Amino acid sequence: MGDAATDAGMDAVQKRLMFEDKCILVDENDNVVGHDTKYNCHLMEKIESENLLHRAFSVFLFNSKYELLLQQRSATKVTFPLVWTNTCCSHPLYRESELIKENALGARNAAQRKLLDELGIPAEDVPVDQFIPLGRILYKAPSDGKWGEHELDYLLFIVRDVNVNPNPDEVADIKYVTRDQLKELLRKADAGEEGLKLSPWFRLVVDNFLFKWWDHVEKGTMHEAADMKSIHKLI
């Protein structure tokens, strides 16, 4: 288990998820090699000593005006509390429906599940077949001295008008942004204004892919941008 003093201050909901959720362990080629608790997968000590790498997904949901839905992670999140990030970021779990690698179906099933859990978006608002996997990235990012991320992340894009009812255990705030509004958020984060922080995985996607992919979102040509054969190592 972890450090008792540190864990004692952990939010009860987050603590339960840390030990109940089983993440999918993969190698750097995205082959499944086992599973471990969410707790162990986010301990920097384990990440560094055992090179634990787990599968993840990041949803980028746009409305019909092609504005991107962002969320601010709740203050009780163990990793990266109160940072702004893309619509939803989480992990497929080690269960049959979320282990399916073909057409990224496992990640898409997990995305539908977590959009309901975090943002209250009903499954019928985000049909699994409407998620378009555009790519995969591999990255490592410490959150603080104890916690961090080491993920092979599926980037899932979807254009839908949805009903949003955020879960306060997961989400502190939400907003839709245009390209220009996102660029202003980036400027503020870089300048340290208003205490604004962005998640490291979101920033990697923004810096490497997002704005060119946004063109495809608006043109309805996302399939042309998709590259699920490559794994972009952004470490």
Swiss-Prot record:
<dbReference type="GO" id="GO:0050992">
    <property type="term" value="P:dimethylallyl diphosphate biosynthetic process"/>
</dbReference>
<dbReference type="GO" id="GO:0004452">
    <property type="term" value="F:isopentenyl-diphosphate delta-isomerase activity"/>
</dbReference>
<feature type="binding site">
    <location>
        <position position="90"/>
    </location>
    <ligand>
        <name>substrate</name>
    </ligand>
</feature>
<comment type="similarity">
    <text>Belongs to the IPP isomerase type 1 family.</text>
</comment>
<dbReference type="Pfam" id="PF00293">
    <property type="entry name" value="NUDIX"/>
</dbReference>
<feature type="binding site">
    <location>
        <position position="54"/>
    </location>
    <ligand>
        <name>Mg(2+)</name>
    </ligand>
</feature>
<keyword id="KW-0414">Isoprene biosynthesis</keyword>
<feature type="binding site">
    <location>
        <position position="38"/>
    </location>
    <ligand>
        <name>substrate</name>
    </ligand>
</feature>
<dbReference type="GO" id="GO:0015979">
    <property type="term" value="P:photosynthesis"/>
</dbReference>
<keyword id="KW-0460">Magnesium</keyword>
<keyword id="KW-0413">Isomerase</keyword>
<dbReference type="GO" id="GO:0046872">
    <property type="term" value="F:metal ion binding"/>
</dbReference>
<comment type="pathway">
    <text>Porphyrin-containing compound metabolism; chlorophyll biosynthesis.</text>
</comment>
<feature type="active site">
    <location>
        <position position="89"/>
    </location>
</feature>
<feature type="active site">
    <location>
        <position position="151"/>
    </location>
</feature>
<dbReference type="GO" id="GO:0005737">
    <property type="term" value="C:cytoplasm"/>
</dbReference>
<feature type="binding site">
    <location>
        <position position="42"/>
    </location>
    <ligand>
        <name>Mg(2+)</name>
    </ligand>
</feature>
<keyword id="KW-0149">Chlorophyll biosynthesis</keyword>
<feature type="domain" description="Nudix hydrolase">
    <location>
        <begin position="52"/>
        <end position="204"/>
    </location>
</feature>
<dbReference type="InterPro" id="IPR000086">
    <property type="entry name" value="NUDIX_hydrolase_dom"/>
</dbReference>
<dbReference type="InterPro" id="IPR011876">
    <property type="entry name" value="IsopentenylPP_isomerase_typ1"/>
</dbReference>
<dbReference type="InterPro" id="IPR015797">
    <property type="entry name" value="NUDIX_hydrolase-like_dom_sf"/>
</dbReference>
<keyword id="KW-0479">Metal-binding</keyword>
<feature type="binding site">
    <location>
        <position position="149"/>
    </location>
    <ligand>
        <name>Mg(2+)</name>
    </ligand>
</feature>
<feature type="binding site">
    <location>
        <position position="73"/>
    </location>
    <ligand>
        <name>substrate</name>
    </ligand>
</feature>
<feature type="binding site">
    <location>
        <position position="77"/>
    </location>
    <ligand>
        <name>substrate</name>
    </ligand>
</feature>
<keyword id="KW-0602">Photosynthesis</keyword>
<comment type="pathway">
    <text>Isoprenoid biosynthesis; dimethylallyl diphosphate biosynthesis; dimethylallyl diphosphate from isopentenyl diphosphate: step 1/1.</text>
</comment>
<feature type="binding site">
    <location>
        <position position="151"/>
    </location>
    <ligand>
        <name>Mg(2+)</name>
    </ligand>
</feature>
<dbReference type="GO" id="GO:0009240">
    <property type="term" value="P:isopentenyl diphosphate biosynthetic process"/>
</dbReference>
<comment type="function">
    <text>Catalyzes the 1,3-allylic rearrangement of the homoallylic substrate isopentenyl (IPP) to its highly electrophilic allylic isomer, dimethylallyl diphosphate (DMAPP).</text>
</comment>
<dbReference type="GO" id="GO:0015995">
    <property type="term" value="P:chlorophyll biosynthetic process"/>
</dbReference>
<protein>
    <recommendedName>
        <fullName>Isopentenyl-diphosphate Delta-isomerase I</fullName>
        <ecNumber>5.3.3.2</ecNumber>
    </recommendedName>
</protein>
